Structures are given as structure tokens and as C-alpha cells.
Design a protein with these regions (language model features):
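M16 family metallopeptidases and their MPP-like homologs
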Residues: 1-3, 22-27, 34-36, 94-123, ...
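Histidine-acidic residue clusters that define the catalytic metal-binding segment
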Residues: 1-14, 62-80, 214-254, 279-286, ...
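Residue-level signal for short amphipathic helical patches enriched in basic/charged
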Residues: 4, 164, 236, 330, ...
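Bilobed periplasmic-binding protein-like "clamshell/Venus-flytrap" ligand-binding domains
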Residues: 8-27
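His/Glu-rich zincin catalytic helix
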Residues: 23-138, 142, 158, 171, ...
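Peptidyl-prolyl cis-trans isomerase
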Residues: 179-187, 236
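A short, aromatic/hydrophobic, helix- or strand-capping loop or linear motif
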Residues: 185, 279-286, 398-402
Length: 437
């Protein structure tokens, strides 16, 4: 790349980017020349699930070795220690010299709505020693990348790069957080980006569907509606947000280190850790409402239509994971599911259709049954009736059910939990089973 010159790029463009292009014009307004074709009607195709072609028979008779599942012994794979008030977990990297350091805070936007805003602004701010661009260069020199992820109930700050420079990267991160310099112009630009993204989201079909789903579950008091209003965004001082960033070193958090030399890491990290002096505020609770058969409608300018039904089910029971996986595989999701085959392949009533039994994140929260139909407006009533028939009288097809069970078992057998996933899967499972939150 260093050998490529500006003239090389110009020569390439002049040689290849000539008149070998296509112009596509998208016109706005009503099409006065639109030709409508009368719906000829579609005769349902009878699906013969028992039939096998010669090709399929040949494949099924080919012997293949069974995949043996590999289960993780988390107690042996994850080493834990305590330095001061900081719990530190370690998983050994057996593959390369790229290490990872994760600071895991048990605070998220449910605890503090301004936290995400503060972290977002931080990305464009410098310090007393470095501008924002210079900070990026300093991380680059170390071969370290940083990442801030904010969730509803936690935040994770991550460093990834050469293990020999990871501690220097942590020192630079601490400097950035504790010495961050407020900048009014940067904050004003960030506000405009946030407001622009909100306006774009209001026109995004998938975002609207997600927002409607949240409204069906939580009503007026949903996370989608609970955002910082524009007036408060503009009234907030950037200094208020940088103080929140500086407080991150004083909040309690735990550490996950993925690398080769844990002893060296503990020795080097210990002098840089500070005892937490602040406490985490209580989270706002978004109460899940009982679903009561209400209909919510959004008038969106589109040729097709989409409809979801959402029903609140029982609270999470981890013993039902296997049954739920088989149900979704057999009945609701995927190209081989009953719903997809009946509504799309057999009756051509939808371009997409599924039923999903979705599990809750924590033990004290509810599962949901979600059905979805994407179809033409004139087919909606037929598709809804067909979906209702399937839901009320679930077809029993032994061969397909056994295939669904085998598929679920093979997914378990073929899944390999490696690298950082060893910790994070255990971490999330630990939260669910013990219901820490």
C-alpha cells in the first residue's frame, strides 16, 4: 500500500471508469402508467414430506462420522483472583499473542440514561495532553484498539491488541477517562448526529416494527420511548457528561483478561487499580404488561404489509431450553419449519412467515410467543387464518419432528465454545441462573 501513489489511483480510474456504467433513476410520485393484473388465484401445493428423490436417497445412505460434543469445564478453564475490591477472571489464549482486557460494569442505561450519551461524546474528545486524533494515533502506535459497549444493565470497556502493550493501553485508557477535556463544539455536533439518527430511525421499517413490539410488551413505559428529549440534550452541559466519564474509575467493576501470562498481568495491573468510592444507582424498572389482544397499527408507505402477534408466556425456566429449541426448529423457524412450508411453499400466502418462542434474559422475566407474517395486503386475511389454524391445531408429522430433534442435537454437538466465549457464555449463564440482577 505504501508504494501506491496518487497518480496510480488516477491512472486506474481513467482506465477502468469510463462509459461502462448503468444509470438507474428512481422517480418519485404516482405511476400513471401502472398496469394491474387480475389476481389469478393460487392452488395450494400438497407437500409430500415423505417422498425422497434418488439424489436425496443417495445422500442419506452415505455414512458420515458422528460429531462428538465437547463440553467446557468452566471451573478449570476460567481462573479467578481478587486484587483489592476487583474480581479478575482469566482465560488462557492458546492461539496467538493478541490479548484482550475487558472492564465489566454492572451499570447500564437502565441505571443512568446519560451514560450512553457520555460515552458517545467521549469518542470525539481529547485530553490535556492529546487531541482526539492524537489519542487514536497513540493507541495505534501501541497496536491497541478500544471499544465501549453500553447495554440496558451493564457496560463493557474493552482493549484488544499485543499482550506486551496491553498494560500501556490500559494506562492510556485511564488517562483518557480521567483527563478528558470538554468541548462544546464536539458536543453540539454529537447532539445533531443523535437527532439525525432518531429521525432516520422513525422512517426505518424494521426499527418501527421493533418499537411496536416493545410497545406491545411494555406500553407507554418502554425503553424505546424513554430517551433523553431534545430539550434536555441541548440544555445539558458537556462538563456534566465528562464528569460522568471521569467517575468510571471510581465505580465498581470486574476485569476479564484473555492472554498468555496471567502472573505478569496481575503484577502490572495491580498498581493501576483504584478502590471504588461510588455506588451504582438503582435501575429503572420497565414492567412487562399482560398482552390483552390489542391492535397497534402504523401507517407506513409500502407495497407489502407486515404483521406480528405477541403473546406473553410464562417466566423463564432454564429446564425448558431443549423443548423450546425443538419447537422452534420443528414448527416456527427456518425453511424446513411447518409454518414456512405451509404458508409460503404450499399456499404462497406470505413472502416470509415464522413463529418463535423467545426466551427471557433473566429468571424473573417472561418468555414471549411471537408470530410474523409478511405478505401482500390482499392476502392478509387468508394468511392470518392459515396461521391461526396451524397454531390451534399443531400438525403432528413424526418424520419432521425427529429431524427437528436431530437438528437441535447436532447444533449442540457441533458448537465449539472457544477463546473469550468461554468466559462470556459462563458470565451470562451465571447471571441468568443466579438471577443476580
Amino acid at each position: 500500500f505504501q508504494k501506491i501513489t496518487k497518480q496510480d489511483v488516477v491512472d486506474f480510474a481513467q482506465k477502468f471508469f469510463q462509459k461502462n456504467y448503468v444509470i438507474v433513476k428512481k422517480l418519485r410520485g404516482e405511476n400513471e402508467n401502472l398496469i394491474r393484473v387480475e389476481n389469478p388465484g393460487i392452488t395450494p401445493v400438497k407437500i409430500n414430506r415423505e417422498a425422497q428423490s434418488e439424489f436425496l436417497t443417495e445422500i442419506l445412505h452415505q455414512k458420515s462420522s458422528e460429531i462428538t460434543p465437547k463440553f467446557i469445564d468452566y471451573k478449570n478453564m476460567i481462573e479467578e483472583t481478587q486484587i483489592g475490591d476487583k474480581k479478575i477472571s482469566f482465560v488462557k489464549n492458546k492461539y496467538n499473542h493478541i490479548a484482550q482486557l475487558h472492564l465489566i460494569y454492572k451499570i447500564g442505561t437502565d441505571h443512568d440514561k446519560e451514560l450512553f450519551l457520555a460515552v458517545q461524546v467521549l469518542q470525539y474528545l481529547g485530553t490535556s495532553r492529546f487531541s482526539a486524533d492524537q489519542l487514536s494515533q497513540e493507541f495505534f502506535k501501541l497496536g491497541i484498539s478500544n471499544d465501549f459497549k453500553t447495554y440496558d444493565d451493564q457496560m463493557i470497556i474493552s482493549l484488544t491488541g499485543f499482550e506486551e502493550n496491553l498494560i500501556k493501553g490500559f494506562e492510556l485508557l485511564k488517562h483518557w477517562i480521567t483527563e478528558v477535556k470538554p468541548d462544546d463544539e464536539v458536543y453540539e455536533s454529537t447532539i445533531e448526529l443523535i437527532l439525525e439518527s432518531r429521525n432516520v430511525a422513525k422512517k426505518d421499517k424494521s426499527r418501527i416494527m421493533t418499537a411496536l413490539s416493545h410497545y406491545a410488551k411494555f406500553g407507554e413505559n418502554s425503553r424505546f420511548r424513554d430517551v433523553i428529549p431534545e430539550e434536555k440534550l441541548r440544555a445539558t452541559k458537556v462538563e456534566h457528561l465528562t464528569e460522568k466519564v471521569k467517575n468510571l474509575t471510581q465505580l465498581p467493576y470486574e476485569i476479564f483478561f484473555y492472554g498468555k501470562d496471567f502472573e505478569r498481568f496481575k503484577e502490572k495491573i495491580q498498581p493501576l487499580l483504584e478502590k471504588a468510592t461510588l455506588t451504582i444507582p438503582k435501575p429503572k424498572i420497565y414492567q412487562e404488561l399482560e398482552t390483552q389482544g390489542k391492535v397497534f397499527f402504523t401507517n407506513y408507505d409500502m407495497v407489502q404489509m407486515e404483521m406480528s402477534k405477541i403473546g406473553r408466556a410464562s417466566q423463564l425456566n432454564t429446564e425448558n431450553y431443549g423443548k423450546i429449541n425443538v419447537f422452534n426448529e420443528y414448527f416456527g423457524r427456518g425453511l424446513s419449519s411447518i409454518v414456512f412450508q405451509e404458508l409460503r411453499e404450499s399456499k404462497s400466502l406470505a413472502y416470509s412467515a415464522y413463529v418463535n418462542y423467545s426466551t427471557a434474559t433473566y429468571l424473573d422475566r417472561h418468555n414471549y410467543v411471537v408470530s410474523y407474517i409478511g405478505t401482500q395486503a390482499n392476502k392478509l386475511h387468508l394468511a392470518v387464518d392459515a396461521m391461526a389454524d396451524l397454531m390451534q391445531d399443531l400438525p403432528q408429522i413424526p418424520t419432521q419432528f425427529n429431524n427437528a430433534k436431530n437438528s437441535a442435537l447436532k447444533q449442540i454437538a457441533s458448537t465449539r465454545i472457544t477463546r473469550t466465549n468461554i468466559f462470556f457464555i459462563f458470565f451470562w449463564s451465571f447471571l441468568i441462573i443466579l438471577n443476580i440482577y
